[in-house]
C-alpha cells in the first residue's frame, strides 16, 4: 500500500453517541506532541500535522490539560487559528488529572471543574469545547456532583457534550442519569479487551459513543517488542508490565502472528489492529496518536482494510493470551476497575 494512496482514503463521518455529535470515523490523539518528560516536538511540524489531518478528513482531535501540562492545548489552539479551521473540527479535551509537587492528583469537585474548563478555553483560544471529558473519576466526589457542574457548563454554552474516561459501568449509569453522556473514552485494542464484558454493552444500551484510546497497544502493534528498545528513558511505557522483561518476549509472538496476517492482507500490522477496532461498530471511534505525517497516513489507510468474521476471530485468537497488565500497580487505581464514587447523599458542598 503506497504512501501516496494512503493519504487519499476517504474518511467517513459517524455519529458519536446519541446526543447529536458527529465526528470523523477516526480521530487524532495529540498527547505525544507534547511529551511530559521530554522536549516538545517542533511546533511547526506539529501544526503542519494537525492541518494535514484536517485536509485528509480527520477532524476529531483529542487533548487534555494534563498533556505538557497545558502546552498540548496551547499547540492545538494555535493550529486551529485562522481560515475558518475551528468550524471544521471537533475538539475534545479533558480535566481532572494533574501533577502537583511531582505527585499525581485527581479532582472532580465543582470549583475545580469550572476552573479547569475556563483554563482550557483560554489555552485553546475557543469559546466552547465540543467534548469535555472527566479524565479520571474522582473517587472522593459523587459522580452526580461532577456531572452536575458539567451540566451547568453545557447550559452556559462553554461545552457542548460531556464525556467520561476510564469509568465503570455503574459510574457511567449514575452520570448519565444526571445529564446524557455523549462518549466514554477507554483503552480498547486487540490486547486490551476487558471493557467488552460490561462497559461496552452499557454504553450501547444508553446510546453512548465509544472512543478507543491506545488502539495500537501503546505502539506495540506498530513495531512489536523492538518498541521497548527505542523508548526514551522517561517514557512511562517502560513501567507497563506488558513491556517488562519476561513479558515482552512472550508478547512478541502476538505481534509476529499479526504481522504475518498483515502481510497476507497487504497492509501493515498497525493498520490491521486499527481495522479490528473499526470493525467493532460505527459507534466506536479510535484515536491513534502520532507525530509523523507518514504514520498518520498509514493510520488513515486502515479505514480501507476489510476483515471477514473469520479474520476477526483469527486476529483475536492471536492476542488471547497477553502477558502482563496494561498499567503498572501504582496506576491501577486510575482505571475503570477502581472508579466507584460515594453516594450523592454523602456529599457536603463547601
UniProtKB/Swiss-Prot annotation:
Name of protein: Probable aldo-keto reductase 1
Annotated residues for binding of substrate: 135
Enzyme class: oxidoreductase
Record keywords: NADP, Oxidoreductase
GO molecular function, one term: aldo-keto reductase (NADPH) activity
InterPro entries named among the record's database cross-references: Aldo-Keto_reductase, NADP_OxRdtase_dom, NADP_OxRdtase_dom_sf
Gene Ontology cellular component list: cytoplasm
Active-site feature positions: 67 (proton donor)
Pfam families recorded: Aldo_ket_red
Stretches assigned to coiled coil: none
CDD domains: AKR_AKR13D1
Residues engaged in binding NADP(+): 214-224
Enzyme Commission code: 1.1.1.-
Similarity section: Belongs to the aldo/keto reductase family.
Keyword presence, NADP: yes
